[in-house]
Regions:
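Conserved beta-alpha-beta core of the PfkB/ribokinase-like small-molecule kinase fold
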Residues: 151-230, 247-249
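Conserved phosphate-binding/catalytic region of the ribokinase-like
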Residues: 2-6, 11, 25-33, 48, ...
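A short, aliphatic-rich alpha-helical micro-motif
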Residues: 145-147, 203-204, 234
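Conserved phosphate-binding/catalytic loop of the ribokinase/pfkB sugar-kinase fold
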Residues: 101, 105, 116-162
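Glycine-rich phosphate/adenosyl-contacting loop at the front of the ribokinase-like
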Residues: 1-77, 87
Length: 314
């Protein structure tokens, strides 16, 4: 599986903490959302919590880590600072054998970090300081970085900063030139709301593979139920992967619908990495030319494993 998939995304250190619903209400946080914050707010929140765990994160990076767990050979490009969190991030990816083509700068902006609040229902709510990760730009990536891969996987979160949005478009241009498939995750429903028109244009004009959960897909398609969204998406010659939590997953391929049941678990501890690890299982099988049902099954297995622990890594 050497040099088959390249992930590009925000290099974010995850800081995990357990809280109750009152904490979210007190801090005006919407459960299940990702809120972008500045460094002073990050530091203020961090000082008010008891940290459970710190590990390298970021949506696409989590997916690449999952592929490495399955003995694949993924690569990842992200931007870090040469600070404490940057060192943690670099060491973490190198340890699990993700080929990390990092852009390291010693500047005023710190390495990105996200406080992940886990409530008793296992839902995750994130406050993310993008830091230097959001400065990943066209100048940091060239054709040599992408040449030879089968798939480039990008996250919707990159559109939250203009610099990374331009880089996203540049990577698409390089991918098309080199006959590389472009895959994208929708990241979260609020990200889709912020960039819906742009994401829809990407789907129509540029993407080969789109991954999102049921709510994200419905928001993208402006539909109230999944069946209506699926009927619209069947019109496009794309691979669409839709996760539905305990209701399983759906794939749209060649105008056909494939359903897959979820893997039952005894106890859910943290939903943080469910979608990211589902994508890892899907891509591992897809790159091995497995049938679409097996791609979904392996995705479901990895998602089930990761939600039984704190954190987004296996």
């Amino acid at each position: 599986m050497s040099k088959k998939i390249l992930g590009i995304g925000n290099a974010i250190v995850d800081v995990f903490v357990k809280v109750d619903d009152n904490f979210l209400l007190k801090n005006n946080l919407i459960k299940g959302s990702m809120k972008l914050i500045e460094k002073d707010e990050f530091d203020s929140l961090k000082s008010a919590i008891k940290i459970e765990k710190i590990e390298a994160g970021g949506s696409v990076a989590n997916t690449m880590a999952g592929i490495a767990y399955l003995e694949g050979f993924p690569s990842f490009i992200g931007k870090i600072n040469s600070d404490e969190f940057g060192k943690i991030y670099k060491k973490s990816l190198e340890k699990i054998k993700v080929n990390f083509s990092y852009v390291e700068k010693n500047e005023d902006l710190s390495t990105g970090a996200s406080i992940i609040f886990i409530t008793p229902d296992s839902e995750r709510t994130m406050c993310t300081y993008l830091g230097i990760s959001s400065q990943l730009s066209m100048a940091d990536i060239n054709e040599d970085h992408v040449r030879g891969y089968e798939i480039i996987f990008l996250e919707g979160y990159l559109w939250d900063k203009g610099i990374s949005e331009e880089m996203f478009k540049y990577v698409i241009k390089l991918a098309k030139k080199n006959n590389i498939k472009i895959a994208m995750s929708l990241s979260d429903i609020f990200c889709v709301t912020r960039h819906r028109k742009d994401f829809f244009k990407l789907l129509i004009n540029d993407l080969n593979i789109l991954i999102g959960n049921e709510n994200e897909i419905n928001e993208l398609m402006q539909k109230n139920n999944l069946l209506d969204s699926i009927n619209e998406l069947k019109k496009f010659d794309k691979i669409i992967i839709i996760t539905r939590s305990e209701s399983g997953s759906v794939a749209i391929l060649n105008n056909e619908i494939t359903n897959c049941e979820s893997v039952k678990v005894e106890k859910v501890l943290d939903l943080t990495g469910a979608g990211d690890l589902f994508a890892a299982g899907f891509f591992k099988e897809y790159l091995n030319n497995s049938d679409i049902k097996k791609c979904l099954k392996t995705g479901s297995k990895l998602a089930a494993q990761v939600i039984q622990k704190i954190g987004a890594r296996l």
